[in-house]
Amino acid sequence: EDGVFLEEGARATASILNTTTGPIYLAKDAEIMEGCIVRGGLALGEHSALKLGTKIYGATTLGPHCKVGGEVNNCVIIGYSNKGHDGFLGNSALGEWCNLGADTNNSNLKNNYDEVKAWSYVHKRFSKTGQQFCGLVMGDHSKSGINTMFNTGTVVGVSANVYGAGFPRNFIASFSWGGPQGTMEYKLDKALDTADRMMKRRGLEVDDVERGILQSVYEQTAEFRR
């Protein structure tokens, strides 16, 4: 009622839900924990959770099976990815099986308010996005360590592991390991082991299809890791 839609098993406890800017939808068994402040529109997927004190600005879509905390503005986080702790994420899109460490933050607006450029796989260079607000785009199975800072319009590929003090470069190639001090190749076998361990925590595993996709991405993106 009043723009809030709860599916079976969904619950919101001791939180502020404001639907004057858009509807709020909670899928089956989704949860909004105590102290959250949510401005619609929000779609919270099945078995997803907003952790204590989370602040959400629409338009945002999360899940299924995502845990989200901190401050989130105009983002899409696809299934089984987590941003479970404090930190800002704005105007961003995360693929499946990503994890942002505690206090990961991203910039979504340049200090000079200029149009954002971002890495284009089509042109193999940085290209204008036509956007003044543009945050982080992160591929499946990528991770950030605690206190990671992403600059405006950063593109992170598939199965990358980003960590370290300072701002990493605005384009992190798939299957890279490192941060501001430089990156090295994240070997395919190790990346697959990490993916399998993460998926098994959710009762899943890297099957032949997933393995084939990741191997194909690994081979196709080799030129960007040189």
Regions found by a protein language model. Name each.
Residues E1-G40:
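Extended, small-residue-rich solenoid/repeat segments and analogous flexible loops
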Residues L52-G53, A59, P64-R225:
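Glycine-rich hexapeptide-repeat left-handed beta-helix
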Residues A10, A30, S48, C75, ...:
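Conserved hydrophobic/aromatic pocket- or pore-lining residues that grip, position, or stack substrates
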